Amino acid sequence: MASVHLTLTKAFMVTVFLTLLLNVSITRGTTQHTCSILSRPHPRGLCGSTLANMVQWLCSTYTTSSKVKRQAEPDEEDDAMSKIMISKKRALSYLTKRESRPSIVCECCFNQCTVQELLAYC
């Protein structure tokens, strides 16, 4: 009876192991970069001026869309107060929730990032 129990236990363990192995090889996940106050630069991360220069070079090399300067809103153009006041629409836009996305420093300095992640900051 003990040998039957031992055989079933071994068979169960092999089945669990193979299932986990297949799950790991089949599952394709996306990497999620996380940072905390204790994060330190990755040995192969891009930091400081190196990061800035790389983004500048990639953006100038691989993006074709030129940035168009925002036209001033008609009510802001001629008003002397336009330098210190903004429209209601713009003011309310600051109250909306920002997209929760790691910063470029978190993604590319404290972690190692891809060219596609760098291009997202163009």
From Swiss-Prot:
InterPro entries assigned: Insulin-like, Insulin-like_sf, Insulin-rel_pep, Insulin_CS, Insulin_family
GO cellular component: extracellular region; transport vesicle
Record-annotated disulphide pairs: C47-C109, C59-C122, C108-C113
Major location category of this protein: cytoplasm
Propeptide stretches in the record: 71-87, 91-96
Quaternary state and interactors: Heterodimer of a B chain and an A chain; disulfide-linked (doubly).
Family (UniProt): Belongs to the insulin family.
Record protein name field: Molluscan insulin-related peptide 3
